[in-house]
């Protein structure tokens, strides 16, 4: 499973580790992904999403039904 948020689309980005001597080595910055089950009242079932902490805040703000409609409009299966 790829490390991509289903709500925000955030994915890993690359950058550098920097030592005290300022030597650069490549590294990846990973999103804060969590797997979370949400109860969808309109469908009378749980939906499991893989999303970032920011994605959870978006669901708190907009509601699970609106966010699921956006995800399905993008063609993702949920």
From Swiss-Prot:
- Check the record and name the Pfam families matching this protein: Ribosomal_L28
Q: What is the name of the protein in this document?
A: Large ribosomal subunit protein bL28
Query: PANTHER family attached here?
Result: 39S RIBOSOMAL PROTEIN L28, MITOCHONDRIAL (PTHR13528), LARGE RIBOSOMAL SUBUNIT PROTEIN BL28M (PTHR13528:SF2)
Q: Which gene encodes it?
A: rpmB
- The keyword Cell inner membrane belongs to this UniProt entry's keyword annotation: no
Q: Which domain of life is it from?
A: Bacteria
Q: Which family does it belong to?
A: Belongs to the bacterial ribosomal protein bL28 family.
From which source organism is this entry? Answer: Vibrio parahaemolyticus serotype O3:K6 (strain RIMD 2210633)
According to its UniProt entry, one GO biological process term is: translation
Keyword Ribosomal protein on entry: yes
Question: Molecular function (GO) terms listed?
Answer: structural constituent of ribosome
Q: Which GO terms describe its cellular component?
A: cytosolic large ribosomal subunit
Among InterPro entries, the record links this protein to: Ribosomal_bL28 (IPR026569), Ribosomal_bL28/bL31-like_sf (IPR034704), Ribosomal_bL28_bact-type (IPR001383), Ribosomal_bL28_sf (IPR037147)
Q: Where is this region: Disordered?
A: 1-20
Sorted UniProt keywords: Ribonucleoprotein, Ribosomal protein
């Amino acid at each position: 499973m790829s490390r991509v948020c289903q709500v925000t689309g955030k994915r890993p980005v690359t950058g550098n580790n920097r030592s005290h001597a300022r030597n650069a080595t490549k590294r990846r910055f990973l999103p804060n992904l969590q797997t979370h089950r949400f109860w969808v009242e309109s469908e009378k079932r749980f939906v499991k999403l893989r999303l970032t902490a920011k994605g959870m805040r978006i669901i708190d703000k907009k509601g699970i039904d609106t966010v699921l409609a956006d995800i399905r409009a993008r063609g993702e299966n949920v």
